Amino acid sequence: MFLRRLGGWLPRPWGRKKSTKTDLPAPEPRWVDSSPENSGSDWDSAPETMGDVGPLKTKDSGTRRPPQAAPESSRDTRVYQLGSKRMDSLKKDKAASAIQESARLETGGAVPKLDLDPVDSGGMKNLGVSPQGRLGTTGPEALLEKPGRRQKLLRWLRGEPGAPSHYLQDPEEYLQISTNLTLHLLELLASALLALCSRPLRAILDALGLRGPVGLWLHGLLCFLAALHGLHAVLSLLTAHPLHFACLFGLLQALVLAVSLREPVEDEETADWESEGQGKEAKEQTEGPGRAL
């Protein structure tokens, strides 16, 4: 074995063929013809591979291949990877700035803050991740979660719990708004008809000489009949054009609901102001004797 290694280290140009392709990075192992006819020795007849021979030699000179080629290639790959990671981080920073700008324009100047962690081992930044390892509350998803004016209006119209409305606090009271409105409209119509026909009927009865209890009874009966015929005429007119009067009633009901739903909020605000004023007065009264002492 030692002689075989020694024979491999010694230069023997007549024993094996020299490799002509020395620029290849990793030559494939091949069998060398080391027969007794070529080498002239019996111990050299065993087959051996190029891996046992040692470093390759160039054709022109006996110098070895410089070992700096592999480190240079690995260094180039590392530089390329670092450059690609920096480009990715720059792209993510630009995306984050674009998101902040769009959010600032939508919210009217309020810029949401994105959680930016320090640079990790790969040289990249994590956007929207808190140090505890959980997703931050800020970001495009959080921006989408914030309700806009249209969503608030829809919630207010639907009477949802998240809407700024007091509809769900006392539903029975607010359900009586529409019924009371219809009742008041019919009452106004009947009172207008009665006021319209009361004086003429009273004048007619006085002219006929019907006074006293009999005149009062007749006056009441005639007013009832006149109001009944008047209501029949008005209701027939309303049923002849239901769409137009329904639109008018809807507009009137919307105004009444807007006013009645806004009043409790104002009442609560005034109550809060009054309670705050009373609290300040009580503090001043308690602090007054203390200062005097």
From Swiss-Prot:
Residues 1-95, 268-293 are annotated as: Disordered. Keywords: Phosphoprotein. The keyword Acyltransferase does not apply. Residues 85-95, 277-286 have a biased composition (Basic and acidic residues). Transmembrane segments: none annotated. The modification Phosphoserine is found at S34, S35, S89. This is Uncharacterized protein C6orf47 homolog. It comes from Rattus norvegicus (Rat).
